[in-house]
Amino acid sequence: PICSFEDFEKGSRKALLVMATGSGKTRVAISLVDVLTKADWAKNILFLADRTALVNQAKKNFVNLLPSLTTCNLCENKEDPEVSRMIFSTYPTMMNAIDETRSKDGNRLFTPGHFDLIILDESHRSIYNKYKDIFDYFDALLIGLTATPKDSIGANTYSIFDLETGVPTYAYEYETA
């Protein structure tokens, strides 16, 4: 079983899930969003990926499986982020959106408390010093997803999730898959 929800119940605010390519990382993320929104643990969700193609693919999968969830892809700039419960973005787009996106009343839309849950896709790639500011800025539960084997993930990635190096919250690797 994925233990991150249990960890959140115990007070942890971060989880790193290491799962083999093709084993369903996005599906797990969708299930977690479903459970956390139904439990009223997460009202607004941010999904971050390092490439626009991953953002687009993830949004498509979320919309297919959670059709009642209002979504916005900041990379496409078509939907209104103010009325969307789930925002999809690349890291650079989100960095700009924090300062530039305004609510209808002219205030900053993406305040530190705006998101309750942040999902980082392929988090081993995304943990650059310049993007760590996003995780520090928002006060939200943080779930990282990666297919990189746990022994190949850098120590700085584990430290972002407050984990011991080599010990992710959950691992479902090639040997198991």
Q: What is each stretch, according to the model?
A:
Residues 1-177:
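RecA-like P-loop NTPase motor core of helicase/translocase proteins
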